[in-house]
A protein has these predicted regions:
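A conserved regulatory-domain signal marking ACT and ACT-like small-molecule sensing domains
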Residues: 1-93
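NAD(P)-dependent Rossmann-like dehydrogenase/reductase catalytic/cofactor-binding core
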Residues: 2, 9, 55-58, 118, ...
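Flexible, glycine/charged-enriched surface loops at secondary-structure junctions
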Residues: 40-43, 80-82, 183, 210, ...
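Glycine/serine-rich phosphate-binding loop and adjoining beta1-alpha1 elements at the start
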Residues: 79-262, 463
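Glycine-rich phosphate/diphosphate-binding loop of Rossmann-like nucleotide-binding domains
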Residues: 151, 158-176, 228, 234, ...
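Adenosine-phosphate binding glycine-rich loop
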Residues: 231, 235-236, 359-469
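Rossmann-like adenosine-cofactor binding region
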Residues: 309-378, 384-385
């Protein structure tokens, strides 16, 4: 089934005859080229012609070009301009910095800047902890990238990564009211990245690492967290892993299996795959089998990469060997964070009863849901046009909201497990089913539930520096 790219719409300004016949020809030309007319807005009316803005949805650049050429061939129609609504949304960037207090009088100015601000600065100099109370630090997160692993685009560099980082900052604000700012670094050197983050950290309450390629991302996260006393999280690893675990908790309940008894095959050697395996093990899943292009990672092989060595030593308890297809025999769960179309229907038929398949390669999953449907009980993807979308937007806003609120010094495994449990618990026993194992990213209950769970876990583990009153409806906190 073909699917239109979300948000890919063109606004085409046309001068044309004012007859219905002319518009009918236009509609036919657009439809024949593969476009869909969503809206028509009149801009001006002349004696013999009208100017209209026609909004057209297209599935690809090829369809967009075909629509344009079809219109240009029409007699009596002049294509004045074409605008892409996605590009229009990015004009001038997508985020701004706005003051919380208006500055309209000398009194206002003296409070927010000189001379009054000097007293605030001296108070922080005397007690640096006051920065959490008196500056943006209490609610700010740096979204840091080097542009080496951006979405499915790969190494496109820091400047091209900026629109993605701006979008991430928008989501922080929209979903969790966190003030996030994009930091796009023009270096791929691990040491330089770490030093830069450490030096800019004083004004931030948390660090979100984003779209940094593996295996460098593991080392960068570890080194930065060792040197800072604020939470640091590589979202591509841990946000994804948290949501996968949340979905698996509910999927296991749907098929009536205990998490501890599952055999889970994980395909994907990048950041998300490694973090997912660690989360599964931390939750009690005992049999996790990692697979890369060469087959199952096992203890019979020697690996130059320390992360592969870790996988060999801590997973695949029966030391299975063979291809993905071979190790899927008898498996309960397949989790793919790898490449498109690597699974076949016959692979799914080898799995245990009521297979669970999370195929999350984007935009094309390891197997399409309509192909897998006859052979699986629960199916999830990373796409929004099928049920059970695994999207880390369910995790990172609430995780950072909770960490900032309790002033956590680190994001622990316990806090991430608490986040996964909170996401899973949004869906009740009555609601849970094969096509509903993970809530929508727009479910307004998610962020608050995750934040409360994360803050409570931080307090329990002794990494919270602020005690929250987390009773239902409470929003109070007391410094510890």
């Amino acid at each position: 089934m073909a699917s239109l790219a979300i948000g890919y719409t063109l606004i085409m300004r046309l001068e044309m005859a004012s007859s219905m016949g002319a518009f009918g020809s236009l509609a036919s030309a657009v439809g024949d080229a593969g476009g869909i007319i969503d809206a028509v807005d009149m801009r001006s009316v002349g004696k013999n012609a009208v100017t209209r803005d026609v909004t057209v949805t297209v599935a690809s650049d090829a369809v967009a070009n075909a629509v344009r050429k079809s219109i240009e061939r029409l007699e009596g129609v002049r294509l004045v301009s074409v605008s892409d609504s996605t590009f229009l949304a990015h004009l001038g960037g997508k985020i701004t910095v706005e003051p919380k207090i208006p500055v309209k009088t000398r009194t206002d100015l003296s409070k927010v800047y000189t001379p009054g601000v000097a007293r605030v600065s001296l108070a922080i100099a005397a007690d640096p902890a006051k920065a959490f109370q008196l500056t943006i630090k209490r609610n700010s997160v740096a979204v840091v990238t080097d542009g080496t692993a951006v979405l499915g685009l790969g190494d496109i560099g820091p400047l091209a990564a900026a629109p993605v980082m701006e979008g991430k900052c928008m989501l922080f604000k929209q979903f969790a009211d966190i003030d996030a700012f994009p930091i796009c670094l023009d270096t791929k050197d691990t040491g330089e990245i770490v030093e830069t983050i450490v030096r800019i950290a004083p004004i931030f309450g948390g660090i979100n690492l984003e779209d940094i390629s593996a295996p460098r991302c593991f080392e960068i996260e570890r080194l930065v967290q060792e040197r800072l006393d604020i939470p640091v999280m590589h979202d591509d690893q841990h946000g994804t892993a948290v949501v996968i675990l949340a979905a698996l908790i509910n999927a296991a309940r749907v098929v009536g299996k205990d998490l501890r008894d599952l055999t889970v095959v994980v395909a994907g050697s990048g950041a998300a795959g490694t973090a997912t395996m660690k989360m599964l093990l931390a939750k009690g899943v005992r049999d996790v089998i990692p697979v890369d292009r060469a087959g199952a990672i096992n203890r019979q092989e020697h690996y130059d990469n320390s992360h592969w060595t870790w996988r060999a030593e801590h997973t695949n308890r029966e030391n299975r060997r063979g291809s993905l297809s071979e190790v899927l025999k008898g498996a309960d769960v397949f989790i793919g964070v790898s490449a498109p179309n690597i699974l076949r229907p016959e692979d799914l038929q080898r799995m245990a009863r009521d297979p669970i398949v999370f195929a999350m390669a984007n935009p094309t999953p390891e197997i399409m849901p309509d192909v897998a449907a006859p052979f699986v009980t629960v199916m999830a993807t990373g796409r929004s046009d099928y049920p059970n979308q695994v999207n880390n937007l369910l995790a990172f806003p609430g995780i950072f909201r909770g960490a900032l609120d309790c002033r956590a010094s680190v994001i622990t495994d316990g806090m991430k497990l608490a986040a996964a449990d909170a996401i899973a618990a949004i869906i009740t026993d009555e609601e849970r089913g094969p096509e509903y194992v993970i809530p929508s990213v727009f479910d307004t209950r998610v962020v608050d539930a995750v934040a409360r769970a994360v803050a409570a876990a931080a307090a329990e583990e002794g990494v919270a520096r602020r005690q929250l009153m987390v009773a239902e409806g409470e929003d109070l906190a007391a410094p510890v």
